[in-house]
């Protein structure tokens, strides 16, 4: 009689690609061989075959899994309809979720506390900010060359502006004396790569005799915060020129590359980095599509998100649409997934119906994907 211990490593790896990532910790306990294979990285290789992400709905964190096999078949539904709320995180209402190498940083809705979660190990850690400011705070999660994790916080009350950093090893906050010569909007997305965080930033204009003024029409660029030096790097150029009417957003590719989206009307471009570090970047075109006839799809660079599938040469976008043609209620927002391919391939699917809103709010019921191709982390919290 064949037992689980008799299965080959290759077959085990295939089995693991079909296991929900949040259940892998239970699978590790199945037998000694599977536990040993996890330590050798088999779990991590299998994990990268999945397109799994975490999303936020109604201030709760949910896991999402996507099957992109056979997407060119019109009968194939590319989105797994199962979206599972993470019961372990029900203890906190979340306003934003960030990730770094398999760890999630959940920002409390009232900014009074932070929660770090390792989905693979099932461990959590609450962190209380040193001070409570307002909703214009933003956070970033990363680590230094010694793999010591840290959290960067920026606050801007209109009267007070500054940075603080939390060190996991000392369990303490301290003021950070940095001041980048540019503006990082609090609503902009950030991406963690190799322990550092990359932001979309824009120039900050100082008008004589008046307070600082930000001019929205100027170019955007990348800015990296290095968690080893605890300093911002130089401005890193994007592979295109953009203005205020055009959409720019960033995402990660397998946690070792960065992807940038550029949308101008019905033209969509996605570029990926061929080299990136805190001081230099180079780019290569991944996808360029002119959507004819027009689809009417406008990516929300504040609430939307995306990831790319290199094997199928497609990009999957997640948006929170105010209008759904099947239900003409403009007081609702509908989390929607779009898939776009090189040859004009286009599909869309509403992930769920949002509750009524008293007043339409572009920041409510948004559905930002945190990351895909999730790789588990063995970092202890």
From Swiss-Prot:
Question: What sequence ranges are listed for the domain F-box?
Answer: 1-47
**What SMART domains does this protein's entry cite?**
FBOX
SUPFAM superfamilies found in the cross-reference section: F-box domain, Galactose oxidase, central domain
Q: What is this protein called?
A: Putative F-box protein At4g17200
UniProt organism field: Arabidopsis thaliana
């Amino acid at each position: 009689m064949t037992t689980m211990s008799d299965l080959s490593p290759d077959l085990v790896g295939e089995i693991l690609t079909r296991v929900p990532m949040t259940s892998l910790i239970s699978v590790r306990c199945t037998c000694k061989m599977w536990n040993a294979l996890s330590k050798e990285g088999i779990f991590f290789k299998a994990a990268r075959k999945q397109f799994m992400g975490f999303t936020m709905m109604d201030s709760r964190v949910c896991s999402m899994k996507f099957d992109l096999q056979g997407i060119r078949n019109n009968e194939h539904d590319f989105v797994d309809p199962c979206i599972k709320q993470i019961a372990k995180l029900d203890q906190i209402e979340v306003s934003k979720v960030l990730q770094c190498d398999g760890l999630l940083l959940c920002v409390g809705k009232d900014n009074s506390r932070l929660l770090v979660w390792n989905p693979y190990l099932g461990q959590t850690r609450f962190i209380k900010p040193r001070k409570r400011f307002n909703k214009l705070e933003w956070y970033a999660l990363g680590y230094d060359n010694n793999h010591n994790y840290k959290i960067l916080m920026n606050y801007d009350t209109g009267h007070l502006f500054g940075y603080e950093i939390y060190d996991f090893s000392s369990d303490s906050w301290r003021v950070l004396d940095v001041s980048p010569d540019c503006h990082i909007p609090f609503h902009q997305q950030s991406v963690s790569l190799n322990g550092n965080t990359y932001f979309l930033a824009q120039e900050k204009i100082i008008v004589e005799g008046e307070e600082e003024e930000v001019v929205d029409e100027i170019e955007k660029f990348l800015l990296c915060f290095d968690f080893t030096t605890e300093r911002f790097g130089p401005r890193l150029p994007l592979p295109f020129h953009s203005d205020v009417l055009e959409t720019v957003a960033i995402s990660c590719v397998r946690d070792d590359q960065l992807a940038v989206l550029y949308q101008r009307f019905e033209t969509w471009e996605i570029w990926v980095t061929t080299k990136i570090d805190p001081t230099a970047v180079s780019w290569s075109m991944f996808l360029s599509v002119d959507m004819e006839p027009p689809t009417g799809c406008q990516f929300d660079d504040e609430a939307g998100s995306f990831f790319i599938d290199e094997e199928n040469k497609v990009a999957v976008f997640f948006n929170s649409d105010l209008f759904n043609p099947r239900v003409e209620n403009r007081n609702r927002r509908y989390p929607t997934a779009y898939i776009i391919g090189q040859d004009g391939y286009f599909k869309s699917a509403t992930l769920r119906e949002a509750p009524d809103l008293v007043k339409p709010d572009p920041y409510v019921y948004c559905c930002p994907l945190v990351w895909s191709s999730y790789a588990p982390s063995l970092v202890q919290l």
